[in-house]
């Protein structure tokens, strides 16, 4: 049973001190979280980390059945999304189950992904030279797109986690669950080219650790550091639309499904505890099929 505790109080303190929310707004957030906690207890969900996208959909259905106004539902979703964004920031969770629920219409919001032309532009950036940090960025991009792992998981890769004989990486994911994720020849070649340069860089700065990815001083690259590196790659590629690093994970899943991979396999590769978290990508592939049909069929 979930009871109000430290996490909620930290969130409410955050609303007051950092967001400068009024007392009335903060009270509304508290009531929304209280109602959601009641729902979770009824569903025998004992931690906020266990909540999946499917649980969110069930909760939305319940709100609809109770005839809440669209405005009220939108506010509740906004409150809970903010709470889960806070949990994400505090590294309590790895994914926000409210991400794909829109504010106004409570409709499914499809994950954004890179188109093939955009991926080509990104790879051109990391293959433009063989400088140490460019080689590092090449590994970063090849591994993230080639495995679909989260940015935080990528930051945690250690050299002993690499099994080159089986072309697989040991990943420590959500809830410290471990899984092996395969990687392809492009990622393998990128890692092979990078490791000697990594060793030289670490020797120059007298560093000693097992982190695969390092910064310009030879220290382990953090999650924030990876996001910064990816942002620089994206900027150099001159991509114009609003994008974020997590889209590489979305692109990995979407490309697999578009090319015939089964849902269960994609679920395992992504490290999703529930199949419902993976099913969001079937909507993306349907949109892809429709757009392809509309573009190429003479009677569309």
Curated annotation (Swiss-Prot):
<dbReference type="InterPro" id="IPR050090">
    <property type="entry name" value="Tyrosine_recombinase_XerCD"/>
</dbReference>
<dbReference type="InterPro" id="IPR011931">
    <property type="entry name" value="Recomb_XerC"/>
</dbReference>
<comment type="function">
    <text>Site-specific tyrosine recombinase, which acts by catalyzing the cutting and rejoining of the recombining DNA molecules. The XerC-XerD complex is essential to convert dimers of the bacterial chromosome into monomers to permit their segregation at cell division. It also contributes to the segregational stability of plasmids.</text>
</comment>
<keyword id="KW-0229">DNA integration</keyword>
<dbReference type="Pfam" id="PF00589">
    <property type="entry name" value="Phage_integrase"/>
</dbReference>
<keyword id="KW-0132">Cell division</keyword>
<keyword id="KW-0159">Chromosome partition</keyword>
<feature type="domain" description="Core-binding (CB)">
    <location>
        <begin position="2"/>
        <end position="88"/>
    </location>
</feature>
<feature type="domain" description="Tyr recombinase">
    <location>
        <begin position="109"/>
        <end position="294"/>
    </location>
</feature>
<dbReference type="InterPro" id="IPR023009">
    <property type="entry name" value="Tyrosine_recombinase_XerC/XerD"/>
</dbReference>
<dbReference type="InterPro" id="IPR044068">
    <property type="entry name" value="CB"/>
</dbReference>
<dbReference type="InterPro" id="IPR004107">
    <property type="entry name" value="Integrase_SAM-like_N"/>
</dbReference>
<dbReference type="InterPro" id="IPR011010">
    <property type="entry name" value="DNA_brk_join_enz"/>
</dbReference>
<keyword id="KW-0963">Cytoplasm</keyword>
<feature type="active site">
    <location>
        <position position="246"/>
    </location>
</feature>
<dbReference type="Pfam" id="PF02899">
    <property type="entry name" value="Phage_int_SAM_1"/>
</dbReference>
<keyword id="KW-0238">DNA-binding</keyword>
<keyword id="KW-0233">DNA recombination</keyword>
<protein>
    <recommendedName>
        <fullName>Tyrosine recombinase XerC</fullName>
    </recommendedName>
</protein>
<dbReference type="InterPro" id="IPR002104">
    <property type="entry name" value="Integrase_catalytic"/>
</dbReference>
<dbReference type="GO" id="GO:0006313">
    <property type="term" value="P:DNA transposition"/>
</dbReference>
<comment type="subunit">
    <text>Forms a cyclic heterotetrameric complex composed of two molecules of XerC and two molecules of XerD.</text>
</comment>
<feature type="active site">
    <location>
        <position position="150"/>
    </location>
</feature>
<comment type="similarity">
    <text>Belongs to the 'phage' integrase family. XerC subfamily.</text>
</comment>
<feature type="active site">
    <location>
        <position position="249"/>
    </location>
</feature>
<dbReference type="GO" id="GO:0005737">
    <property type="term" value="C:cytoplasm"/>
</dbReference>
<dbReference type="InterPro" id="IPR010998">
    <property type="entry name" value="Integrase_recombinase_N"/>
</dbReference>
<dbReference type="GO" id="GO:0009037">
    <property type="term" value="F:tyrosine-based site-specific recombinase activity"/>
</dbReference>
<dbReference type="GO" id="GO:0003677">
    <property type="term" value="F:DNA binding"/>
</dbReference>
<dbReference type="GO" id="GO:0051301">
    <property type="term" value="P:cell division"/>
</dbReference>
<dbReference type="InterPro" id="IPR013762">
    <property type="entry name" value="Integrase-like_cat_sf"/>
</dbReference>
<feature type="active site" description="O-(3'-phospho-DNA)-tyrosine intermediate">
    <location>
        <position position="281"/>
    </location>
</feature>
<keyword id="KW-0131">Cell cycle</keyword>
<feature type="active site">
    <location>
        <position position="272"/>
    </location>
</feature>
<dbReference type="GO" id="GO:0007059">
    <property type="term" value="P:chromosome segregation"/>
</dbReference>
<feature type="active site">
    <location>
        <position position="174"/>
    </location>
</feature>
């Amino acid at each position: 049973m979930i009871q109000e505790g430290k996490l909620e109080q930290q969130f409410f303190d955050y609303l007051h001190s950092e967001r400068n929310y009024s007392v009335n707004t903060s009270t509304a957030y508290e009531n929304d979280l209280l109602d959601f906690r009641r729902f979770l207890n009824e569903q025998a969900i004992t931690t906020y980390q266990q909540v999946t996208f499917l649980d969110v959909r069930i909760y939305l259905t319940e709100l609809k059945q109770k005839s809440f106004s669209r405005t009220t539902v939108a506010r509740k979703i906004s409150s809970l999304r903010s709470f889960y964004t806070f949990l994400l920031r505090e590294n309590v969770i790895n994914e926000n189950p409210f991400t794909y629920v829109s504010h106004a219409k409570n409709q499914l919001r499809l994950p954004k992904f890179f188109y093939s032309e955009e991926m080509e532009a990104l790879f051109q950036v990391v293959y433009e030279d063989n400088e140490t940090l460019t080689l590092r960025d090449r590994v970063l991009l090849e591994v993230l797109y080639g495995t679909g792992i989260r940015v935080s998981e990528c930051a945690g890769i250690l050299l002993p986690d690499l099994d080159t004989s089986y072309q697989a990486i040991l990943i420590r994911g959500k809830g410290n669950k471990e899984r092996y994720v395969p990687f392809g020849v492009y990622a393998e070649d990128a890692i092979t080219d990078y490791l000697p340069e990594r060793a030289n860089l670490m020797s120059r700065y007298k560093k000693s650790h097992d982190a695969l990815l390092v910064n310009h001083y030879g220290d382990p690259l953090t999650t924030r550091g990876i996001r910064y590196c990816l942002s620089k790659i994206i900027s150099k590629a001159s991509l114009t639309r609003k994008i974020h690093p997590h889209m590489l994970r979305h692109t990995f899943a979407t490309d697999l499904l578009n090319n015939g991979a089964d849902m269960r396999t994609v679920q395992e590769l992504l490290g999703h505890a529930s199949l419902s978290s993976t099913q969001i990508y079937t909507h993306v592939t349907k949109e892809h099929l429709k757009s392809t049909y509309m573009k190429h069929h003479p009677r569309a």
